[in-house]
C-alpha cells in the first residue's frame, strides 16, 4: 500500500491536538477536554476496511489496509450494531439531531425547497415526509426541528468546524447552512449532496452560495 496515502490521515489528530494546545497557551487555559474529530463517510460498507465490524474478519476485510481505523478502534469504542440509513440526507439528519429516521421523517435525499425527490410510481402513493430536512428553529413546513449536538459543543466552549458534504436541509431553508447547526467555520457544506471540487477555496458547487466562502 502507498504509505503516502496514510500520512495525511495520521496527521489529522496530531494537527487538531496541536491547534488546541496552541489555543490553550494563548488563552492561559488548562483545558483537559478531548478534541473531537468525527468522520461521516457515504456509501461505506461494514466490510470495506481492514477493521472487522463483526466478531471476526471476513474475506473482504483482507482486501483493505486501514491501520488508522484499527488504531482508533483499539484506543476508543467501536459499535458493531449501529446502523445508518441507506441514503445520505436521512443519515446526516440523524447524526446532527440525534434522532432516527422514524422520528425526524427525512426518508429520502433533499434538495429543492418544498419538493419531493421520490420517483413517481403508479402503484404506490408517496408518503408525506419531511422533504425540507431538519432545522434548529420552527417555521418551515415539512421540517423536523431538533437540537444540534454541534451547538451544544459550541455553547460549552468548543471551536467547531465543518468540512465537506452537509446535506441537512433543502435550498433556502435554515438547515441548509452548517453555520445554522453551530459550526463556526464551514468549508464547502451546503444543501446539495456532492461538491464540485475539493481543490478550490470557494465556489464548491454549481450555485454561488454566500456561506461557502
Regions picked out by a protein language model, each given a short descriptive name:
Residues 45, 168:
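Short active-site segment of divalent metal-dependent hydrolases/proteases
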Residues 1-31:
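Bacterial Sec-dependent N-terminal signal peptides
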Residues 33-36, 75-80, 156-160, 184:
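Loop/turn elements at helix/coil->beta-strand transitions in domains of secreted/extracellular proteins
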Residues 165:
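Active-site glycine-centered loops adjacent to acidic/histidine catalytic or metal-binding residues
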Residues 38-39, 46-148, 152, 195:
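Active-site segment of extracytoplasmic enzymes that catalyze sulfate/phosphate-ester chemistry
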Residues 102, 106-108, 178-195:
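Acidic, His- and aromatic-enriched active-site or binding-groove loops in soluble protein domains
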Residues 210-211:
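Conserved small/polar residues in nucleotide/adenosyl-binding loops
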Residues 51, 94, 173-176, 198-201:
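Short aromatic-enriched loop/helix-cap "lid" or pocket-rim segments at secondary-structure transitions
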